[in-house]
Amino acid sequence: MALVTVSRSPPGSGASTPVGPWDQAVQRRSRLQRRQSFAVLRGAVLGLQDGGDNDDAAEASSEPTEKAPSEEELHGDQTDFGQGSQSPQKQEEQRQHLHLMVQLLRPQDDIRLAAQLEAPRPPRLRYLLVVSTREGEGLSQDETVLLGVDFPDSSSPSCTLGLVLPLWSDTQVYLDGDGGFSVTSGGQSRIFKPISIQTMWATLQVLHQACEAALGSGLVPGGSALTWASHYQERLNSEQSCLNEWTAMADLESLRPPSAEPGGSSEQEQMEQAIRAELWKVLDVSDLESVTSKEIRQALELRLGLPLQQYRDFIDNQMLLLVAQRDRASRIFPHLYLGSEWNAANLEELQRNRVTHILNMAREIDNFYPERFTYHNVRLWDEESAQLLPHWKETHRFIEAARAQGTHVLVHCKMGVSRSAATVLAYAMKQYECSLEQALRHVQELRPIARPNPGFLRQLQIYQGILTASRQSHVWEQKVGGVSPEEHPAPEVSTPFPPLPPEPEGGGEEKVVGMEESQAAPKEEPGPRPRINLRGVMRSISLLEPSLELESTSETSDMPEVFSSHESSHEEPLQPFPQLARTKGGQQVDRGPQPALKSRQSVVTLQGSAVVANRTQAFQEQEQGQGQGQGEPCISSTPRFRKVVRQASVHDSGEEGEA
């Protein structure tokens, strides 16, 4: 893709010097002289919304010594071509074609789209222009005219006009199969066949917008609307053979396939399902900028081993759906969109999505609106040998800058499949501390076409190891320093990623809360992947006998029965657990966080509790064996008995002194 800026000026007149003050002449010229920017692709030229008119007028009015405009200024444009798949010769030819087609227009008219069409006779070239006007206060840009342009050959220095079709409110567009579509407006019907699927998709998008605008404005023949189309009607100057092609192709390709029999509906549905499954595979390995719809159908016929002539319109319809999915930016996170070059060139979509930062991961794609958005470029080709890993630290910082401002960022490459998808995966792995498998599953759920090439996948695996090692070192530093890691080890093993999809409805704050909850979730799971720390050990111990723990909590009001049970020796080691959970900030006893105990101290505590419990039980049995008739020993033994019970169960009153 390339960005071309064309200077628009009226044709030079025969007058020598304008009559009147010089500043009035400059102002009149500045109103007419302006620039228009185009995104030039293979087979299509997309007019961009350019805000340079007022700037040009200001510059023109501030330079009274500027020369009068002439037709030569049309060639003094600014061009910025990326090294895409097209050869320099093809790029120069397409650029020259754009200049020649602009010369056919009035100064107040704009090209919204120029799409190259298939030509019946190969030396010739044909373009479809979607043209709107800016003439006068009363006219709006809702008025659109389709123009057909003929070139004798690719190197021709001139072009001619062969078709003029105003778009009225009754305009209808139909798919005719094999990449062709027909436009019916005002009783006239014309057929067009772009040279590639991507060109067809871009053309249909612009046509749909124009048809909706015409319908909303109520443009009907016979009124004052679209009177400027007569200017082009009077200038149809293509050869008669070219004029016949613009009108006769509708009769050649508008034939509809016969309707299916009622009994064959189930078989037809099965065939359509098979076509959908194979179509995705064919498109995945095809270059949408060069492949035609007919070639796609032929590839499907080879895969299925059946003729698909009667499914031409169905194939085109499914292709448009898949291309639309490729063309639409996918919202991966509340603040991050993943898309293609089309999304980067769509100013309306960028503004609607509140995008302020654009991360361009492609070597061949330009920055279309450098004056409107903040850009960061990583100029790499989609090759397995390309090194993305060294750039992921900068891209993460760039994305976080947009999130910190409360705005959104678009990450794009050419198709939003490999380079940009790998960068978004790297961001998710670092930002949300998840594994590569979790990040890939999340991204592909929201954008199924995201498939980094094998080289980028290997770099993502290396990056995953780097992140894991970094988190492990951070945890060990906390352990050496005696600081409780609390929630940090949880995402180290596995951080659930599903809580992220509901977050597009909220902001970044909700995202942080959701991630904290997801990090805390593994703590409640019954010991999957036990860690080498005290929390994991105590969790495993507590899960050995959960029923006994419930019994101990329900019988706290009756202390003597705890030691009268034959399972008291098994229950006592569980008593230190509430204290340890309490010291680690657990949820069993809410008494606030305390300094963490080391593992050696915890083992000593467990042993001491067991000794106290055993001695207490032995003392109780000895007192009970002395007889029922002695009242004073029994009375004196009761307070001591309750005192020892409290020391063993509460564990925070005076256990060290008693031991």
UniProtKB/Swiss-Prot annotation:
InterPro entries: DEK_C, Dual-sp_phosphatase_cat-dom, Phosphatase_SSH-like, Prot-tyrosine_phosphatase-like, SSH-N, Tyr_Pase_AS, Tyr_Pase_dom, TYR_PHOSPHATASE_DUAL_dom
Residues covered by region (Disordered): 1-31, 46-96, 482-534, 547-603, 617-638
A Pfam family of this chain: DEK_C
Catalyzed reactions per annotation: O-phospho-L-tyrosyl-[protein] + H2O = L-tyrosyl-[protein] + phosphate; O-phospho-L-seryl-[protein] + H2O = L-seryl-[protein] + phosphate; O-phospho-L-threonyl-[protein] + H2O = L-threonyl-[protein] + phosphate
Any one GO cellular component localisation term in the record: cytoplasm
Residue positions where N-acetylalanine is found in the record: A2
Segments forming domain Tyrosine-protein phosphatase: 328-469
Cell compartments where the protein resides: Cytoplasm, Cytoskeleton; Nucleus
Keyword set includes Cytoplasm: yes
Protein family (similarity comment): Belongs to the protein-tyrosine phosphatase family.
Protein name listed in UniProt: Protein phosphatase Slingshot homolog 3
Organism: Homo sapiens (Human)
Gene designation per UniProt: SSH3
